């Protein structure tokens, strides 16, 4: 199966729920005038096992350590960019161990 590349260039919240990547927009989460139904529709989930590369290109991205762990365990590369949108960091899976 072909893995997907996810690019995030705007402020975003990334978390994990039921082994799925949860993507939320901070503008929607913080807006108190919106209805709960609209807020729920603004939340997108993606299966972790379908993701191959994640590019983080904004300083206002919030990502949990659970997301990082799940992505790396599924051999996903995580790339961070600077203010000029140039890659400055790469996080990838390092060690696989067996407890036999």
Per-range role (PLM):
Residues 1-53, 57-100:
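N-terminal intrinsically disordered, cationic/polar leader segments
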